[in-house]
């Protein structure tokens, strides 16, 4: 879900409460705060040598000690409006950053209307090799071929010299 879609849904139900449903089915305690809205730009090179970039809008959720606090959809829409100067476009995908033992970022998959509440359903992010065609991961070179166990990291060889990964 992107910023424009999120704002539209929030603005259409400004008096609704907002809750967050984690991918494992647990809920973030209802007295959470959104303490940051960030524009995160990531520039990187994959293991095959291709330069890439990605951008997201990250909302940081923090559970405070004030357990009577409840965030409304209208208030969250207002917070997103305040962030407009730092968000270069409204089609940025939205992620929620939340700490429960470790800080994790979860993509916002959908918003579910439940009575007078909007539930932000979060998904999972996964790692992947972006240069499978260059490093040989499609052929399973990073597994031992029998158990499927990983023998090393993704693309640990020089793909430019035709060695593929883990060779």
Predicted regions and their residues:
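Short connector loops at helix/strand junctions that flank enzyme active sites
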Residues: 29-31, 52-56, 89-91
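Oligomerization/assembly interface segments of phage tail-like spikes and tubes
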Residues: 53-65, 122-124
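Cysteine-cluster motifs in flexible loop/terminal segments that predominantly coordinate metals
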Residues: 126-167
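Helix-rich interaction surfaces within compact, conserved domain-sized segments
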Residues: 82-134
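Short amphipathic alpha-helices in soluble, non-transmembrane regions
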Residues: 73-79
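Short, conserved charged micro-motifs
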Residues: 67-73
């Amino acid at each position: 879900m992107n910023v424009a879609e999120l704002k539209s849904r929030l603005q259409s139900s400004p008096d609704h409460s907002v809750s967050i449903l984690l991918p494992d089915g647990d809920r973030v305690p209802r007295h959470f705060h959104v303490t940051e809205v960030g524009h995160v730009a990531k520039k990187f090179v994959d293991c095959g040598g291709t330069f890439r970039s990605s951008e997201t809008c990250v909302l940081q959720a923090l559970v405070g000690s004030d357990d009577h606090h409840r965030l409304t959809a209208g208030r969250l829409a207002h917070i997103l409006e305040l962030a407009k100067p730092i968000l270069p476009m409204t089609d940025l995908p939205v992620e929620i950053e939340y700490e429960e033992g470790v800080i994790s970022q979860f993509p916002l998959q959908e918003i579910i209307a439940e009575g007078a509440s909007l539930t932000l359903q979060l998904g999972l992010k996964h790692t992947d090799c972006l240069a499978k065609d260059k490093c040989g991961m499609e052929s399973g070179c990073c597994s031992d071929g029998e158990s499927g166990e990983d023998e090393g990291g993704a693309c640990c060889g020089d793909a430019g010299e035709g060695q593929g990964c883990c060779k």
